[in-house]
From Swiss-Prot:
Transmembrane segments: none annotated. It comes from Homo sapiens. Disulfide bonds: none annotated. Induction: Expression is not affected following staurosporine (STS) treatment. Down-regulated 6 hours following beta-carotene treatment, remains down-regulated 24 hours following beta-carotene treatment. This is Humanin-like 4. The gene is MTRNR2L4.
Length: 28
């Protein structure tokens, strides 16, 4: 259970990082 939640959290963080990078590229 704990590991599943951790992996889910990691996945969401990586998704946020990707979206942030996309926005950064769009701004520039």
């Amino acid at each position: 259970m704990a590991t599943q939640g951790f992996s889910c959290l990691l996945l969401s963080v990586s998704e946020i990082d990707l979206s942030m990078k996309r926005q950064y590229k769009q701004i520039r």
